[in-house]
Amino acid sequence: MRECISIHIGQAGIQVGNARWELYCLEHGIQPDGQMPSDKTVGGGDDAFNTFFSETGAGKHVPRAVFLDLEPTVIDEVRTGTYRQLFHPEQLISGKEDAANNFARGHYTIGKEIVDLCLDRIRKLADNCTGLQGFLVFHAVGGXTGSGLGSLLLERLSVDYGKKSKLGFTVYPSPQVSTSVVEPYNSVLSTHSLLEHTDVSVLLDNEAIYDICRRSLDIERPTYTNLNRLVSQVISSLTASLRFDGALNVDVTEFQTNLVPYPRIHFMLSSYAPVISAEKAYHEQLSVAEITNSAFEPASMMAKCDPRHGKYMACCLMYRGDVVPKDVNAAVATIKTKRTIQFVDWCPTGFKCGINYQPPTVVPGGDLAKVQRAVCMISNSTSVAEVFSRIDHKFDLMYAKRAFVHWYVGEGMEEGEFSEAREDLAALEKDYEEVGAESGEGEEGDEGEEY
């Protein structure tokens, strides 16, 4: 079996986790108490959904997941929520005091007290797997638990499970909407370790997803629940082929192979289509070509950056529902002829497609319409550099005056770590610039030295 262990860190990670497991349970017909009436064989471990759920002797399905936070309030919502019986109490780990938006608290002082307990729980989950294929990590880098404890945990996972792939779903700070003053510091420090310790990172940003909810679903004032449900559709589409059978199945390690041209260039954009409200869907059924085009629309991107400003290196299209390979090939051929969608010249094919026959499931009472077919796109584009340069700029403005730095140093960090992380990101921006440049002007020499 190819099991995946999910790790949800900090408030963002946990709330995305809630939406995600709610959706998975609906997709597989698992009740909130973990029972699955449709699953006749008790303890049968060969079903496709066992990649994400383990089955107990009593026929209860338990997510292979750990939720962790440094303060209890958010996890207490899981402990008392609808799905409280789904999780084993040991999977919900909470500390006593907050990381207080401080990377250093999450990474050094408070994080290091809890990290061994987390690794212990993860080890238990891993021992329960027959063929662990990797970890999915959900966190935000603007706060402190997601950034500090998230980085610490990823570093430790690299040591303990060196060869297993790690996929991150990372909420980055948005250009306009800010939740804390020190976001730029936390993000830069955290990205510094994401660069080294994740294999693929999917960037999400709240503002972009707000706009999608407002524009496509006509929700005037989207809540986090609206956002998280949209994000969990994306994550569900990504993992659908691990959980259901289809024509073209895609493994987690396959994302890495197909999307990451150089180890550092692994920050992905994602988009999902069709995002339409129930009222509209009643009147229109979208074809494969239409949803494919809409997945490439800059407005569909779940991070605030414009793919027209960069070039695509690779892109992965995951279709689900009523889709046949012939339609997919036609849609992809059309995309390739469009001048607005440009690929780097050293990657001529650039597309990986997956098809899964399970149509998208929607949460009852949710905002998304039930549709026959949907597509989720994960793409590696040089325009992602915009996200980093925006954060770097804000970092520089604050760091020039050393504003707020004493809070980090007081928690046992050294000032040198700031400049080291910032230099690493400067190098990353440069890497993206070089990758997007036209090849052939003697750049091959430089690249050989760099990687």
Curated annotation (Swiss-Prot):
Keywords assigned by UniProt, alphabetized: Acetylation, Cytoplasm, Cytoskeleton, GTP-binding, Hydrolase, Magnesium, Metal-binding, Microtubule, Nucleotide-binding
Q: Write the lineage as a comma-separated list.
A: Eukaryota, Viridiplantae, Streptophyta, Embryophyta, Tracheophyta
The protein's required cofactor(s) are namely: Mg(2+)
Function, as annotated, reads: Tubulin is the major constituent of microtubules, a cylinder consisting of laterally associated linear protofilaments composed of alpha- and beta-tubulin heterodimers. Microtubules grow by the addition of GTP-tubulin dimers to the microtubule end, where a stabilizing cap forms. Below the cap, tubulin dimers are in GDP-bound state, owing to GTPase activity of alpha-tubulin.
Q: Which residues carry this modification: N6-acetyllysine?
A: 40
Instruction: Enumerate the subcellular locations listed in this protein's record, separating them with semicolons.
Output: Cytoplasm, Cytoskeleton
State the residue spans of region: Disordered.
Answer: 429-451
Q: What class of enzyme is it?
A: hydrolase
Q: Which reaction does it catalyse?
A: GTP + H2O = GDP + phosphate + H(+)
SMART domains linked to this entry: Tubulin (SM00864), Tubulin_C (SM00865)
Select a single GO molecular function from the record's annotations and give it. Answer: metal ion binding
Any one GO BP annotation for this protein: microtubule-based process
Ranges annotated as biased composition (Acidic residues): 431-451
- Name the predominant localization: cytoplasm
Site note Involved in polymerization, residues: 451
What family does this chain come from, according to its entry? Answer: Belongs to the tubulin family.
Q: What is its EC number?
A: 3.6.5.-
Q: Name one GO cellular component term.
A: cytoplasm
Post-translational note: Undergoes a tyrosination/detyrosination cycle, the cyclic removal and re-addition of a C-terminal tyrosine residue by the enzymes tubulin tyrosine carboxypeptidase (TTCP) and tubulin tyrosine ligase (TTL), respectively.
Family annotation (PANTHER family): TUBULIN
Its subunit composition reads: Dimer of alpha and beta chains. A typical microtubule is a hollow water-filled tube with an outer diameter of 25 nm and an inner diameter of 15 nM. Alpha-beta heterodimers associate head-to-tail to form protofilaments running lengthwise along the microtubule wall with the beta-tubulin subunit facing the microtubule plus end conferring a structural polarity. Microtubules usually have 13 protofilaments but different protofilament numbers can be found in some organisms and specialized cells.
List the CDD domains hit by this protein, alphabetically: alpha_tubulin (cd02186)
Q: Which residues form the active site?
A: 254
Descriptive protein name: Tubulin alpha-1 chain
Which positions does UniProt annotate for Mg(2+) binding?
71
